[in-house]
C-alpha cells in the first residue's frame, strides 16, 4: 500500500518492484498528471483518490492503510520513489511467522550513480494489518498500538532502494515539522 501524487514517471519502476504482492492499494492525494489513469491499467492495483486537508503525511498513510482489507496478514508500505530488490516477497514469507508483528530490513536512502549505497539504515514499513497506525505530520512513524508485546524481526535479505525525485519541492515540510514538535 502507499500514497502518491503526480508520480507518473515512477509508476513503471515502482510497479515492477511491488507486483510480487497479492494486491496493491494506492491512495492518490490529488494528482494532476496521468498517475491515476496509469495506475488503473495495472493488474492487482486498486487506486482511490482522496483530498487530505489539511495536508499531513500520517493522515494520508493511515487512509491508504485503511484501504487494505482487515483479513490481510502482512502489509508492505512502499513509496513510489522506492524500489525493492527482486525476491523480497519470498524472503518475507521465509522469515515471517504468525507471531511476527513487524519486519525491519535494509533501506538505501542514498545511492551513487552505480547504485552503491551512500547512506543506509534499517527501515520497518512491513507490518501485520492490525495494531498499527502512522503518527507525525511529516517524517511519519509507524506506531504499534497493540496490547501484546510487539515482535519485530530483522530480514537482512530484503533491501529497499530510494530514488528521490529531486525536482519535487519539500517546502511544505518545515511547517509540518513545526506542527510535529507542537504535538510532541
Predicted regions and their residues:
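A conserved acidic beta->alpha catalytic loop
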Residues: 17, 27-38, 52-54, 79-80
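Acidic helix N-cap motif at the loop->helix transition within catalytic regions
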Residues: 9-12, 33-41, 87
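Conserved donor nucleotide-binding strand/loop of the catalytic core
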Residues: 37-67
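A short acidic, amphipathic alpha-helical/loop segment
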Residues: 13-17, 38, 63, 90-91
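Structural beta-sheet core signal
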Residues: 2, 26, 102-104
Amino acid at each position: 500500500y502507499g500514497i502518491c501524487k503526480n508520480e507518473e514517471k515512477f509508476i513503471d519502476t515502482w510497479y515492477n518492484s511491488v507486483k510480487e504482492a497479492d494486491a496493491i492499494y494506492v491512495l492518490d492525494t490529488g494528482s494532476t498528471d496521468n498517475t491515476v489513469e496509469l495506475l488503473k491499467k495495472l493488474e492487482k492495483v486498486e487506486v482511490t483518490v482522496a483530498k487530505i486537508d489539511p495536508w499531513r503525511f500520517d493522515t494520508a498513510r493511515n487512509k491508504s492503510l485503511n484501504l487494505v482489507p482487515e483479513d490481510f496478514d502482512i502489509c508492505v508500505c512502499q513509496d513510489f520513489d522506492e524500489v525493492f530488490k527482486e525476491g523480497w516477497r519470498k524472503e518475507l514469507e521465509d522469515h515471517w511467522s504468525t507471531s511476527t508483528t513487524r519486519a525491519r530490513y535494509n533501506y538505501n536512502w542514498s545511492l551513487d550513480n552505480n547504485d552503491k549505497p551512500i547512506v543506509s539504515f534499517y527501515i520497518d514499513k512491513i507490518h501485520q494489518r492490525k495494531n498499527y497506525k502512522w503518527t507525525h505530520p511529516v517524517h511519519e512513524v509507524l506506531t504499534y498500538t497493540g496490547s501484546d508485546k510487539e515482535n519485530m524481526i530483522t530480514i537482512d535479505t530484503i533491501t529497499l532502494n530510494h530514488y528521490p525525485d529531486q525536482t519535487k519541492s519539500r517546502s511544505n515540510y518545515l511547517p509540518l515539522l513545526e506542527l510535529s514538535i507542537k504535538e510532541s
